[in-house]
UniProtKB/Swiss-Prot annotation:
NAD(+) binds at G8, A9, G10, N11, V12, G13, D32, N94, V117, T118, N119. Belongs to the LDH/MDH superfamily. It comes from Methanosarcina barkeri (strain Fusaro / DSM 804). PANTHER family: L-2-HYDROXYCARBOXYLATE DEHYDROGENASE (NAD(P)(+)), L-LACTATE DEHYDROGENASE. NCBIfam families: MalateDH_bact, PRK06223.1. Keywords: NAD, Oxidoreductase, Tricarboxylic acid cycle. It catalyses: (S)-malate + NAD(+) = oxaloacetate + NADH + H(+). Substrate binds at R81, R87, N119, R150. One of its GO terms (biological process) is tricarboxylic acid cycle. Catalyzes the reversible oxidation of malate to oxaloacetate. This is Malate dehydrogenase. The gene is mdh. It comes from the Archaea. HAMAP family: Malate_dehydrog_3.
Length: 307
């Protein structure tokens, strides 16, 4: 049976554990630095199993040693965005947290695959890779699945159709410079560009780019966690089941899309060994330009880090 460890027992981490438990993908360890928090949430989720009908083993702990021999580790630790705070504002605090988390992953689960969820996503994923010392394909970030889901949701709302029929694609940095791709977005196989005029698509793209901030402003405290946890679990399932799904993820680029040595949201094939392949899509010039701006922002931030 697979072993999955979730670092961080906040809203995103605990909701991820709930979804993993309900799917019975493997035994789960949830760890957090706050005493009692992971233990209490684990106990609650264990008792929920009697009602929902799952027998998943769930351990809540403050001890990193419990993640030993994990097949998959999901990082959700760190502080969340507050109203008016950009993802880049998070870098100083979260980079230190994730460096420490990553060193413990390397110590106790050296053969694991790592999915990072902590923001600023692309930069923190780079820190996780460097701090673990793992192969780049074994460390990747959850970004595009969430952003694509938001894009798909807005499209379904606009067209008054089922979300099940929308296949959306968003690449680029996880932040203000993400790149939704209408030409690779379909509704039951029909290109979005055949269904909506450019101005309406542009409004949906703008709302997608601001999707996380919109929720932060409404909540006043904290940020989204239902959709992020759903996105995390879709990626985790692809790894645990070795299903070779094509999903957008923040992956390490080595010449792909003209970029070198950074993490960036791109379509990838996910399986038991992590990122098994990066798919290159043809983009128009404006999309390439946005990617270049996004990558430059990430690169400049990384150059200022002390790793």
């Amino acid at each position: 049976m697979a072993k999955i460890s979730v670092i961080g027992a906040g809203n995103v981490g605990a909701t991820t554990v709930q979804r993993l438990a309900e799917l019975e993908l493997g035994e789960i360890v949830m760890t957090d630095i706050v005493e009692g928090l992971p233990q209490g949430k684990a106990l609650d989720l264990i008792q929920a199993g009697a009602i929902k009908g799952y027998d998943t083993s769930i351990i809540g702990t403050n001890d990193y040693a419990e993640i030993v021999d994990s097949d998959l580790v999901i990082i959700t630790a760190g502080i969340a965005r507050k109203p008016g705070m950009t993802r880049e504002d998070l870098i100083k605090t979260n980079s230190k947290i994730i460096a420490e988390v990553s060193r413990n992953i390397a110590k106790y689960a050296p053969d694991s695959i790592v999915i990072n969820v902590t923001n600023p996503l692309d930069i923190i994923t780079y820190i996780a890779m460097k701090s673990t010392g793992f192969e780049t394909k074994k460390v990747f970030g959850m970004s595009g699945v969430l952003d694509s889901g938001r894009f798909a949701s807005f499209i379904a709302e606009e067209l008054k159709c089922s979300k099940k029929d929308v296949q959306a694609m968003v690449i680029g940095g996880h932040g203000d410079l993400m790149v939704p791709l209408p030409q690779y977005t379909t509704v039951s196989g029909v290109p979005l560009t055949d269904l909506l005029p450019g101005d309406r698509i542009a409004r949906l793209v703008e709302r997608t780019v601001n999707g996380g901030a919109e929720i932060v402003e409404l909540l006043k405290q904290g940020s989204a966690f239902y959709a992020p946890s759903a996105a995390i679990v879709s990626m985790a399932e692809a790894v645990i089941k070795n299903s070779k799904r094509i999903l957008p993820a923040s992956a390490y680029l080595e010449g792909h899309y003209g970029q070198e040595g950074i993490y960036f949201g791109v379509p990838v094939k996910l399986g038991a060994s992590g990122v098994e392949e990066i798919l290159e899509l043809k983009l128009d010039e404006s999309q390439y330009e946005t990617l270049r701006k996004s990558s430059e922002t990430i690169r400049n931030t990384i150059s200022q880090l002390e790793i």
